[in-house]
Design a protein with these regions (language model features):
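Patatin-like phospholipase
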Residues: 1-65, 73-427
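Catalytic cores of secreted/periplasmic lytic hydrolases that degrade extracellular macromolecules
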Residues: 68
């Protein structure tokens, strides 16, 4: 069982076929910053056009964490993946739905002001304790640290825009008025406990506020106050949290995870580059590359443990995980918090997901067929399909200097071998 395919043997699918009429299908979306949202939109567009018998705006349940919460809330409100691509990736369409990246990087002026007001009192207290000889330098620094803002950017513009989007005709900002279950996961700052907004007892919070709480990454955005408590990014506690859906008698769960560690040993032609300098090993890229790989590995290890646990606790539920190829230098080289290359990244996610579907076609057919879901082979095999109108080749901060014909041939050969391996596994 691999992280990308948690399905049981084909014989198990056949034995369940008689009891899967009217199968219930759920969608779980992990976080990953702006890069994660962009990747998930591109991947969902590829899945939407390829999977016949499933509507992503009419799933039987949604769970979203952090950036995945934005996407899940939109889908639950009837916004198709293509509509979200138009609004966020291409920035065209109706003004009400248009999502401009500037709303995510508005300075948290009110937070700055509130902390600045504390500074004179903290300085006076520190000076007094130093004069009395009762405080060390470390204690003084810790005390003055209270004046530092808890976030660089403000959540308010994000919440206000989402409230406007979800207040449009046919949509709602109220969990209780949705036709289907939506769960947005945040983390209680004071206890570290999971906050599953949308479940009974947690559904009196506006969807727009729950989304901002779920995506309040400490350091970037201030904690979001709801009632008497403060909440931060749900990814601090969970990577996917698909168990919310598994406990609701869901038969099939589609999971999307945008952040994976990079396998730098796959293709030596993919040389790491920082500016014009070639970096033969990730460690030579310094803190940025090492930190990125470490963060991705930490997040993904939790996901792997969770997926293994789901298979044990819910053996009768099929789970299909979609994520970037661990050997993909484009996704590892992209800035997790960048919006500037969103068209190229979305197109890359769209095309790489289509490749993933082609590689896993037989295994996915065996999983989906008992649930009444088919794969549109003509659509999947159409080489002319594109997601956005303008999609130049993405050039991240580090990349292979000049991918030659041999490199391209090796990548194509790798894809063929992957498909052969998948075919043998399901034969």
């Amino acid at each position: 069982m691999t992280p990308s395919d948690t399905s049981p043997p084909a014989s198990a699918h056949a034995s369940r076929a008689t009891r899967r009429k009217g199968a219930r299908v759920g969608l779980a979306l992990a976080g990953g910053g702006p890069l994660g949202a962009i990747w998930e939109i591109g991947a969902l567009c590829a899945l939407e056009e390829t999977l016949v018998g499933i509507a992503f705006t009419r799933m039987d349940g949604y769970v979203g964490i952090s950036a995945g919460g934005f996407i899940a809330a939109g889908l639950a409100n009837g916004m198709t993946p293509r509509q979200m691509c138009t609004a966020f990736i291409e920035n065209v369409g109706g003004d009400d739905d248009l999502i401009h990246p500037s709303i995510f990087v508005h300075p948290a002026w009110s937070e700055y002001a509130a902390r600045l007001k504390m500074l004179p009192r903290l300085v006076a207290q520190a000076a007094w304790r130093i004069a009395l000889g009762t405080a060390s330098g470390v204690e003084v620094i810790e005390r003055l640290g209270r004046a530092l803002p808890t976030g660089v950017f403000s959540n308010a513009p994000i919440e206000a825009h989402l409230r406007s989007v979800f207040s449009a005709p046919g949509r709602t900002d109220d969990f209780r008025k949705l036709d289907r279950r939506l769960v947005l996961v945040a983390t209680d700052l004071d206890t570290g406990a999971v906050a599953p907004f949308g479940l009974p007892g947690w559904d009196d919070v506006p969807i727009s506020r729950a989304v901002t709480a779920s995506a309040a990454l400490p350091g970037l955005y201030p904690p979001v106050r709801i009632g008497e408590r403060h909440y931060v990014d749900g990814a601090l506690k969970k990577t996917l949290h698909a168990r919310v859906l598994l406990d609701q008698d869901i038969d099939l769960v589609l999971c999307l995870n945008p952040l994976v560690p990079f396998d730098a040993t796959y293709a030596p032609t993919h040389t790491v580059r920082l500016g014009t300098d070639a970096i033969p090993r990730l460690v030579e890229g310094g803190l940025p590359l090492v930190a990125s790989q470490g963060f991705r590995s930490l997040i993904h290890s939790r996901l792997e443990l969770g997926m293994a646990g789901y298979g044990l606790s819910h053996p009768d539920v099929d789970i299909a995980l979609f994520e970037p190829d661990h050997r993909d230098p484009e996704m590892f080289g992209a800035n997790t918090f960048s919006y500037s290359a969103r068209r190229q990244l979305a197109e890359h996610a769209y095309q790489s997901t289509r490749k993933n579907l082609r590689t896993r076609r037989r295994a996915l057919h065996a999983m989906f067929q008992p649930h009444g879901i088919a794969i549109a082979d003509k659509v999947l095999d159409d080489p002319t399909r594109r997601l956005v109108t303008y999609a130049p080749r993405l050039t991240p901060a580090w990349h292979d200097a000049a991918p030659d014909r041999l490199g391209g041939a090796l990548r194509r050969l790798g894809g063929v071998l992957d498909e052969l391996q998948s075919s043998l596994a399901t034969a």
